[in-house]
Amino acid sequence: GDVYKRQAQETAPLPKVLYETMTKNQGLAVSLDRPSCQDTGVLQFWVKCGTNFPLINELEGLLKEAVVQATFATPLRHNSVETFDEYNTKRNVGKGTPTVFWDIVPNDDHCEIYSYMAGGGCTLPGKAMVLMPGAGYEGITDFVLDQMTSYGLNACPPLLVGVGVATSVETAALLSKKALMRPIGSHNENENAAKMEKLLEDGINAIGLGPQGMGGKFSVMGVNIENTARHPSTIGVAVNVGCWSHRRGHVIFDKDLNAVCDTHSTIDLNA
């Protein structure tokens, strides 16, 4: 993964040791079949589903059941606290969780499920706001860099930074989460947006957060921007962040429920 790449590119002694520890940690997680971090996060799913997919009506219930099973089988840390009542459900499900974001595709019978484990540290830098139109793309840049200099240290860098640009806080926030579903190293299809991804990546790297915020050449693994058209009088912008272990999965089902997982090559879902 990208941590191995950053390890090879780093030259200073301390960050090299930290990267070596990270890669050893990942190797142990695989060999021992254990989570790579004690904070296994809140389970979130982004579902791109065709209207003719046979399990579309049951899908949210199945995902909730899968989270409960994984909580005890893996095991996963209990990370679902009911707000206002302030008790832990101890099953990783509760009111509105796991969160399922939907993209409905008409006249299609496939289903793509992105899974994401949103840890506490990497969630902390998340923020959304609406800028005056005169702030322009410089305002977007300032917003992102301010969040990274203020909170990036606590988010277990190097980070994957998702940026959403739209009209309002909720549309920008959803896009910034969707940006984290894209692979590291991918680029926005809009040439100007792709240029901004690179400029932001270079700018955040120049902060020098390094692995675990201890200093180094790299602060991020990449910056992914997702965007929509906006109202001419507003610029909605949001940031979401993934930590160095960036626990993301992607499974594709056809109408016969044959499955392919392109993020984890050792998993055979059809066995």
Q: Which residues fall in each region the model found?
A:
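A structural signal for small-residue-enriched, beta-sheet-centric alpha/beta enzyme cores
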Residues: 79-271
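Translation machinery proteins
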Residues: 8-34, 89-94
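A generic, well-ordered mixed alpha/beta core segment in the N-terminal half of proteins
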Residues: 41-106
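Short, glycine/acidic-enriched capping/hinge loops at junctions between secondary-structure elements
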Residues: 32-33, 46-48, 55-58, 126-128, ...
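Catalytic, metal-anchored helix/loop core of enzyme active sites in primary metabolism
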Residues: 37
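Mid-sequence acidic-hydrophobic segments that form the walls
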Residues: 25, 66-77, 118, 147-151
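Short, small-residue-biased leader/transition segments that mark boundaries at the very start
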Residues: 1-4
